[in-house]
Amino acid sequence: MNLGKAGLTALAILMLASQGTSAPAAATVSGKVTLSGTAPKAKPLDLSKEPECVKMHAAEPLQPENVVVGPGNMLRNVVVYISGGLADETPVPPNAVMYDQQGCHYTTHVLAFRVGQEVKISNSDPFSHNIHPIAKINREWNKIQLPGTPPFSYAYDREEFIPVKCNIHSWMQGYFVVLRTSHFAVTGEDGRFMLPDLPPGRYTITAWHESYGTQTQEITITGTESQTLNFVFTAKP
């Protein structure tokens, strides 16, 4: 086949364009987080200061969520994230993350989101709440929300692990985990996490739990092959 000079030039341009649009190599790091030892025995929360809450949970008492384990002692509510090694990050998502006060508790106990990303806070209960994120690095604030009022939004400027409480209902507790990185996950009942789309490089991966602190591990990615990384926290005596 004789393409001629013009044909060869067009073919070269096409090949270069194809190379330029190919996706860079990326891998996935996944694993599980377990608790070694016996989890503390949970005592139902005392809701007696709010009779409506007592009625809501008459059939099934509301339990604390600071230490929750699933089958096989898999640990829930652990934030696993890239804490070192990433040079570039994706833009902050334009959509807000949702945080609701419903049934006398926070529907998401540990909510992780990006620095600069809005968190939209709702009150779905038929009574007032006063949400109070106790920030130390970012600005601390608290806001009362009457029943039936619209949600409000807030964004944080700096990375921080922020305890959240309700000034009206002392048993309502949670965490805002504000991260610079876009590579993070929060474990569910199965204790598993997945961090996809990691280009080749050396990374520090951190696992954080509100009761058991932090652990870090180093991992090197050389191509697109998936890797497994597990964390084990030790129960307190």
Regions found by a protein language model. Name each.
Residues 1-6:
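Positively charged n-region of N-terminal signal peptides that target proteins for export
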Residues 20-237:
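Extracytoplasmic copper-binding redox domains, predominantly the cupredoxin/blue-copper superfamily
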